[in-house]
């Protein structure tokens, strides 16, 4: 495998059963070199912000379960393909019923499809959302946050983060190794899904929803220092029963030239696989609640008995 991913799980026994606490990534390596190394939880994947019934809702790190005054976010279905390279997760964010006679709780379904490859310097995560609240959702914001550590935690202070406006890729590399020799890691989307905003910053200062601000600040470069990167997409209106999708690619490379060649190849492949993801999302089995997940409800005490 060109890219090795170590997922965050609750315990070894849970992993053997085929379940995990979502799809959170603990470490990522490219050809034996670390590009992600024990990141902060809020800088490790997807975050969603939106307005429902004129109230703001924020879900950080959507690979993990959340409880809040606005509702419950939990994984209801998890499947892995025979090859072990394709994983499909389904999550539900349920709002409290407003009326006793409501037959179903208003909810948003999130489908997460992870595509890995044996000999390619990239992998994909497709995030798809379905609005089943019965009402339009306003100002739906989808974010990707990553706290890359090029060559691992021991070298984190040498990183430089940049946003490339030509390819709409945000990436990090090691300043000591230089552009031509360094390991690179970055994220982006399809050619038709240009991010609205971006940010290169330190993990401590990167935008994390302070002072009611919901937009990234378009800082195009940071470093050399400990860096983190983020991209943001905005959908003003998310209508009832509509689907919205955010295809994400994570790319690695050795040297600037190799990295951007890999970006081109990854984007072509991403757009091909996106068609199969839509078919998978429409499969009714994706929303079938796994009784084991529902019963255990991700309680570590119960799960590990």
Q: Where is each model-derived feature located?
A:
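Short Pro-Gly-centered flexible turn/kink motifs
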Residues: 236-254
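Polysaccharide-binding surfaces and accessory modules of carbohydrate-active proteins
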Residues: 1-11, 15-19, 24-29, 39-42, ...
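N-terminal targeting leaders for non-cytosolic proteins
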Residues: 35-68
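Non-catalytic terminal regions with compositionally biased, polar/charged low complexity
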Residues: 259, 264-305
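Beta-strand-rich interaction surfaces with strong enrichment in secreted/lumenal proteins
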Residues: 112-115, 232-237
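Aromatic sugar-binding interfaces of carbohydrate-active proteins
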Residues: 157-160, 246, 269-272, 276
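Short, basic/aromatic beta-hairpin or loop at an interaction surface
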Residues: 214-225
